[in-house]
Regions:
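Nucleotide-activated donor-dependent transferases that construct or modify glycoconjugates
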Residues: 1-11
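Secretory-pathway luminal glycosyltransferase catalytic domains
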Residues: 3, 39-153, 161-166, 172, ...
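Donor-binding and catalytic core of enzymes assembling or modifying cell-surface/extracellular glycoconjugates
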Residues: 13, 154-266
Length: 278
């Protein structure tokens, strides 16, 4: 009788790609069924993931073994064949996926590389413009611009969660709704957030960037189809770049430095076409 590998999805599309990939790799290794458990019945990510070709099925689990990040790799053991396992974690460790990227790429609907010699920057702003715990370690516009100089490209695209790509005022930024609501005691002064974002608008004006509003899946696939990719520490953009045919990829080397010892190794993946920027 087949076992089942189930995984608890958390909030966040990029997180879900990691969770799905970790669960499916293990399920295929153990010849088990795969079950994805959304955080809520109305979770926005269900439709987005289904649009990628990921299926949601329900199955009752029988006395499942609970597995978290730190003991995930130990599950590649045939003694677990036929058993039910439930994964709970983020599984953000490039060594799990590095030598299986071609296999993982085949799980997703193919996208055609645009071959327009463009550079696509994924810029997660939104709620992260307010978060005090990470704001003062974030790369500024000048750091992005130095990284951009490492690419040879004809046009620039910016993929972002900002409702508009233009100068903002404090009132406008305060009234914008994002992925998460940041409590007042965890926010930086609004003036600093405004200055931070407006520096990007000013700095990138010379490139006349193309900025369009898309769905999460369309953003993911747009990045995947790019010749050149630059991003900071987004899990969505990490996966989009990892399974792309991009000629060159720049990833922010420190990744998420404010996490200290809990920082992940994702920027260290030794892919030949990737480089680190700071």
């Amino acid at each position: 009788m087949k076992g089942t590998i189930a995984v608890n999805l958390t909030n966040g599309f990029g997180n879900n790609i990691f969770q799905y990939s970790a669960a499916r790799l293990l399920a295929e290794h153990l010849d088990s069924d795969l079950v994805l458990i959304p955080p809520t019945k109305n979770y926005y990510g269900i439709k987005e993931l289904e649009n990628l070709g990921i299926k949601f099925v329900e199955k009752k689990l029988n006395n499942p073994i609970n597995v978290i990040d730190k003991n995930y790799k130990m599950c590649y053991n045939d003694v677990l064949k036929g058993r039910d396992v439930i994964l709970s974690g983020y599984f953000e460790d490039y060594t799990i996926y590095f030598d299986k990227l071609d296999q993982i790429k085949n799980w997703f609907k193919p996208v055609k590389n645009r071959k327009d010699n463009s550079l696509t920057i994924h810029m997660r702003t939104g709620d992260r413009l307010f978060m005090k715990n990470e704001f003062y370690t974030k790369p500024r516009a000048e750091h992005y611009l130095k990284a951009v100089e490492k690419f040879d490209f004809d046009e620039l695209h910016i993929v972002t969660d900002m409702p508009k790509w233009d100068y903002v005022t404090a009132d406008e930024l305060n009234n914008m709704k994002f992925h998460l609501d940041v409590p007042a005691n965890e926010r930086v002064p609004i003036g600093e957030s405004v200055k931070f974002f407006n520096e990007f608008i000013e700095g990138f004006e010379k490139y006349n960037p193309n900025v369009q509003k898309r769905s999460i899946v369309d953003d993911f696939n747009f990045i995947r189809a790019s010749d050149n990719i630059l991003f900071e520490h987004g899990t969505l953009s990490w996966w989009a770049a990892a399974i792309s045919d991009a000629k060159k990829v720049g990833v922010y080397g420190p990744w998420r430095p404010w996490k200290g010892d809990k920082n992940k190794n994702l920027s260290n993946i030794p892919l030949k076409n990737w480089f680190k920027w700071e």
